[in-house]
Amino acid sequence: MNIKSLTKIALAMLVGLAAATAQAAQTYLPFTLASNDAGTTAAKLDGTKKALTDNGFEVAGEYSPYAGAYVIVVTNDELKKAAASHSRGGYVAAQRISLTEMDGKVQVSYTNPVYMSYAYRVNSKLAQTSAALKKALGYVQDFGPSEGMDAEDLNEYHYTFGMEYFDEPLELASKGSHDAMVAEIEKNLGAKRSGAAQVYKIDIPGTSQTLFGVSMKAPNEGKKYMDETFIMGEIDFKPLRSTAHLPYEILVKGKEAEALHARFRIAVNFPDLAMMGDNSFMNIMPTPDAIRDVLTSVAGGKSQDDDF
């Protein structure tokens, strides 16, 4: 083999190595900032919803979790198809968009579909959804922690030793059928049991999965650790707000109801949240159990012992 051939082989190997390294290095952040312009949520809300529906999205629900914040939840055919790809894929059916007032401007942001797809082990690029969101709302930057995670890290994500993975959900309750479980949740959310209320409901075609969005407001100070306003006040403190973390979910699969454990659900959206100190997990230590108790009550299940 002559020098020229060896040079070509070496060059090809280097190009292949560079391509593999670039692919392996692709990382994702949990949120996307679409715009940050002067104005108010009231002035921008209708236009935001119209832009979403004009680009193929169906508004599944909306609400204001607290003053200065508004969340719109949408879905589309691509998201529902991805949700149907495995028995617990329903979580990816809901795409959350937030409008947050900060310093005279409104941050319009949304959950990064690709990030959530890998976190929920659906593993779809959701190209149509990502493109439609950018077309409808715009694009400034992705945001969240200082460093993103790649697909493998997201598939196997947990915050630290002893913290739950995606496949370690809360088993809330079981009824005689899927319809009975759905009806129980709808009844209890309608009654605002334990301070919870329904934000949206999405049925996943071709499956026995139904996803509920659940808002949570503490009925009194003693229940503050389940309250969205309290929780977000502790964990969502950066200049770019992550309001689209909300709301939490209950997934009905077959005749059973489950929810992502809050130690996963919070951490996957705030992976750089400190364990101790100001604005840390320590400040919301009772929150995972408090959320579990609310969602269990909504599903008609029995309360469990605290994890800590």
Predicted regions and their residues:
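Short, surface-exposed beta-strand/loop micro-motifs that present aromatic residues
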Residues: 97-98, 199-201, 246-252
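Charge-biased, low-complexity intrinsically disordered regions
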Residues: 26, 87, 105, 166, ...
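Hydrophobic alpha-helical segments and helix pairs
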Residues: 108-149
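Bacterial N-terminal signal peptides
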Residues: 10-18
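Mid-chain, structured segments of secreted extracytoplasmic proteins
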Residues: 70-112
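Terminal, regulation- and interaction-focused segments at domain boundaries
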Residues: 24-66, 141-217
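A cross-kingdom marker for long, charged
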Residues: 207-308
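Bacterial N-terminal signal peptides that target proteins for export
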Residues: 2-10
